[in-house]
């Protein structure tokens, strides 16, 4: 096959252009892409480091290793009582929440049995259990809860990823969220005098629930 002079010139010109383009691309420094960063979600210290509930001279806490609830004298630090609940607490994970209602009722989440248990604050004796009419889903719930005035509860549930308010009867009163983040470690509660603050740090969400709905 033979080429005319014009075709040879065009072919050589094409090779020359490709060479220049290749050299330019080889020497060109890669452009750095700016990766947007998100500021940490502002959580109050009381939500990250919650204070153990206290009633009079007694401070209540949980022992995750022994799976018990304890009451200590706030002055001396003496162990007043230790309780295993109705028929022992099943705590398969990190969640073992405890709360004292505005009415002075001590409630503990037996998450493995998917219920709340009420203990006598003075003796640790089991008094009653509570669970919603529609049982908690997942393996172990609720992972966060607050006992409201009048026997109501607000809960945060993993797996089903819900924030709900329940009546004393167990009936659902209000559903605040159905799309919490996947990890329970992003769920936080901060208890103030009249309001409970609930947070999902991963989704940067915040809810406020009054302790007394009628107040």
PLM feature spans:
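Eukaryotic scaffold repeat domains enriched in small/polar residues
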Residues: 4, 10-215
């Amino acid at each position: 096959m033979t080429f005319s002079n014009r075709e040879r010139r065009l072919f050589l010109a094409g090779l020359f252009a490709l060479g220049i383009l290749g050299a330019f691309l080889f020497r060109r420094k890669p452009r750095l892409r700016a990766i947007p960063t998100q500021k940490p979600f502002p959580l109050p210290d009381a939500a990250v480091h919650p204070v153990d509930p206290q009633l009079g001279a007694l401070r209540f806490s949980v022992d995750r290793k022994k799976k018990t609830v304890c009451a200590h004298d706030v002055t001396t630090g003496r162990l007043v009582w230790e309780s295993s609940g109705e028929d022992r607490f099943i705590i398969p994970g990190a969640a073992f929440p405890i709360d004292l209602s505005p009415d002075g009722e001590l409630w503990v989440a037996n998450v493995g049995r998917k219920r709340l248990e009420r203990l006598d604050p003075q003796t640790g004796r089991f008094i009653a259990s509570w669970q919603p009419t529609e049982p908690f889903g997942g393996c172990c719930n609720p992972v966060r809860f607050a006992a409201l005035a009048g026997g109501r509860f607000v809960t945060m549930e993993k797996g089903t990823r819900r924030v709900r308010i329940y009546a004393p009867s167990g009936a659902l009163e209000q559903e605040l969220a159905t799309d919490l983040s996947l990890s329970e470690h992003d769920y936080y509660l901060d208890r103030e005098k009249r309001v409970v603050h609930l947070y999902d740090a991963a989704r940067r969400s915040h809810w406020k629930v009054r302790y007394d709905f009628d107040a």
